[in-house]
Amino acid sequence: MNNYTKDDDGRLNNFAVEPKIYAADAPSKADKRNYLIMAAITVVLVAGLIAVAVVASGAST
């Protein structure tokens, strides 16, 4: 793939070449399940971090 184009007179055009656009595939049932599992793990981790922060801030006073 060239990083340039030429016009009808043969002059170089240094503008970016636009990539071909395509539609993404819809996520499968397995993908959706994996996203749900990752979201649940993330919620648990963030809740744990917040709990540790609350306990640590209360313990220092």
Swiss-Prot record:
The annotated subunit structure for this chain is: Part of the photosystem II (PSII) assembly intermediate RC47 complex (with D1, D2, CP47, PsbE, PsbF, PsbH, Psb27 and Psb28); minor amounts are found in other PSII complexes, including mature, dimeric PSII with PsbO and PsbV. No HliA or HliB are detected in any of these complexes. Its interaction with PSII requires both CP47 (psbB) and PsbH. HliA/HliB and Psb34 probably bind to a similar site on CP47; their binding seems to be mutually exclusive.
The consequence of inactivating this gene is: Normal growth, photosystem ratio and O(2) evolution under all tested light regimes. Greatly increased levels of HliA and HliB are detected in monomeric PSII in normal light (40 umol photons/m(2)/s). High levels of HliA and HliB are visible at all times during growth in high light (500 umol photons/m(2)/s). A double hliA-psb34 deletion has high levels of HliB even at 24 hours, grows very poorly under intermittant light (5 minutes 500 umol photons/m(2)/s and 5 minutes dark for 8 days).
Major place of localization? membrane
Per the entry, what this protein does is: Involved in photosystem II (PSII) assembly and/or repair. Probably involved in conversion of late PSII assembly intermediates into mature dimeric PSII, it may mediate the optimal equlibrium of HliA/HliB among the intermediates containing CP47 (psbB) to facilitate photoprotection during assembly.
Q: Does the keyword Membrane apply?
A: yes
Membership in a protein family:
Belongs to the Psb34 family.
- A cellular component term, taken from the record's GO annotations: plasma membrane-derived thylakoid membrane
Alphabetical list of InterPro entries matching this protein: Psb34-like
Tell me the Gene Ontology biological-process terms attached to this UniProt entry.
photosystem II assembly
Ranges that cross the membrane: 36-56
Q: Which UniProt keywords apply?
A: Membrane, Photosynthesis, Photosystem II, Thylakoid, Transmembrane, Transmembrane helix
What gene codes for this chain? psb34
Name of the molecule in the record: Photosystem II assembly protein Psb34
UniProt source species: Synechocystis sp. (strain ATCC 27184 / PCC 6803 / Kazusa)
Instruction: State the membrane topology.
Output: Single-pass membrane protein
What is the induction note for this entry? Expressed under normal light (40 umol photons/m(2)/s); less is made under high light (500 umol photons/m(2)/s), which disappears after 2 hours (at protein level).
